[in-house]
Each structure stands twice: as structure tokens, then as C-alpha cells.
Amino acid sequence: MQDEERYMTLNVQSKKRTSTQTTQLTFKDYSVVLHWYKILLGISGTLNGILALALISLILLVSQGVLLKCQKGSHSNTTEHEDIGDLKMNNGTRRNTSNKDLCVSRSADQTVLCQSEWLKYRGKCYWFSNEMKSWSDSYVYCLERKSHLLIIQDELEMAFIQKNLRQSNYVWMGLNFTSLKMTWTWVDGSPLDPKIFFIKGPAKENSCAAIKESKIYSETCSSVFKWICQY
């Protein structure tokens, strides 16, 4: 009986000792795992930081390359536009086109999509008619095609239009004399900047602007000419 009690006591003590050792091993293993987890987490953070820096550097290099490419092409493009010739403008209004303007226009050219038979230039689309209509009918025609009559903003655009006219006839543009404002006004509501070009002819009610060769003329709006749509 005593031997049996001694055996049971030893057995219980052995189980307690084994349980304690197992618990200690579990805590020890957890500490090791936690230690390596922290190390791996640190390595992962470092790698992510390196990748982020590499990506930023790559973006900067690409941006500098695009800018440099635009700058290199600026001189040749300016010469090309000068060779085209331009419409008659006020004295002293010619200005140099900056590299930034050229780069922006190239970027716009890459994103804009023009319909068939439309010409693309500096982020805009142009359509040159073969028919002849009055100024108001030309205006409506462009609106129906989700566009508007030609609005010229600078000498480069004027040179582009002149290059593509290829005719000596009058062509309507989106400019008319409004009696309400008593000034030449574009179809978008903005007034004509007199520094851009001269308008040859009277500035009076029922007068609309038309391009012919290298000049802008004031003509009666009911006259029938070809026209240019733009969007």
C-alpha cells in the first residue's frame, strides 16, 4: 500500500515537472519566433523603403528625359513654324514660344483623339470645309458636330491654319462684331485681343471675320464662304 502511494506521488510530481518544462519550452519558442518576426519585419521595411526610393528616382529620370527631349526639339519646331509664315499681326507682338509651352502642347497631342478627316495640332482638332455657307450656318454646322468655329489663340496656331488652307478664298472663323459689346468677340464669348492680329475692314453690326491668305477681313455675315470647325 505504501509502495502504491509512493508510486502515485512520484507519478504526479513527474507530470507536474513535465508540464512545467513544456510551458517553459513554449514560452521560449514564442520568444524566438517573436524575435525573428521583428527581424523580418525590419528587413521588409528596409526593402520597401529602398524600392520606394528607386521608384521615385526612376520617375525623376524619366521626367528629366522628357523635358530634355522637349528642350532639344524646341529650336527646330520654332524654326518650322517661322518657315510656314504667319498671318498679318500687330508690330511688336511676336513672342518666343517657351520650351514649357511646346512640351505641354506635345503632351496634349498625345492624349487628344481627332475624328476622321480632322487635323490634330497642339491638343486641338480642326476640320476644313469644302462647302460654302453663311457665317451663322457655319456656326450651327460646327455646333451640331460638338465643335465650334475656329478660335485662334496665338501666332503658331495662325501659322498652322494658313499652312492648311491651301486656297485663296475667304474662310469663316469664330469671330464676329457684337453690337451689344461693340467689339470683336470670339464664339466662346471672349473679346479679341487686338495684339493678336489686324482685322481689315469695318467694325460694325453684322460683320464677321474671315481669313484669306495672310490676312483677316471683316465681311458681311450673310456672305457664303468655307469655314473651319475646331474642338
Curated annotation (Swiss-Prot):
Where does this one sit in the cell? Membrane
Pfam families to which the protein is assigned, alphabetical: Lectin_C
- An example Gene Ontology cellular component term from the record? plasma membrane
TM annotation in the entry:
39-59
Q: In which broad location class does this protein mainly occur, judging by the first location in its UniProt entry?
A: membrane
Alphabetically, the GO molecular function entries are: carbohydrate binding; transmembrane signaling receptor activity
The record's section on CDD domains has: CLECT_NK_receptors_like
**What is the protein's membrane topology class?**
Single-pass type II membrane protein
Q: Which InterPro entries match?
A: C-type_lectin-like, C-type_lectin-like/link_sf, C-type_Lectin_Receptor_IMM, CTDL_fold, NKR-like_CTLD
Q: Which residues carry this modification: Phosphotyrosine?
A: Y7
Q: Which Gene3D superfamilies match?
A: Mannose-Binding Protein A, subunit A
An example of a Gene Ontology BP annotation on this entry?
A: NK T cell activation
The residues exposed to the Extracellular compartment are: 60-231
Q: Enumerate the UniProt keywords alphabetically.
A: Disulfide bond, Glycoprotein, Immunity, Innate immunity, Lectin, Membrane, Phosphoprotein, Receptor, Signal-anchor, Transmembrane, Transmembrane helix
Question: How does it associate, per the subunit comment?
Answer: Homodimer. Interacts with CLEC2B.
Function, as annotated, reads:
Functions as an activating receptor involved in immunosurveillance upon binding to various ligands displayed at the surface of myeloid cells. Upon interaction with CLEC2B ligand, stimulates NK-cell cytotoxicity and cytokine production leading to the cytolysis of malignant CLEC2B-expressing myeloid cells. Actviation of the common cytotoxicity pathway involves SRC and SYK kinases.
What is the designated name of this protein? Answer: Killer cell lectin-like receptor subfamily F member 1
What is the native source organism of this protein?
Macaca fascicularis
From the broadest rank down, the organism's phylogenetic lineage runs: Eukaryota, Metazoa, Chordata, Craniata, Vertebrata
Which gene holds the coding sequence for this protein? KLRF1
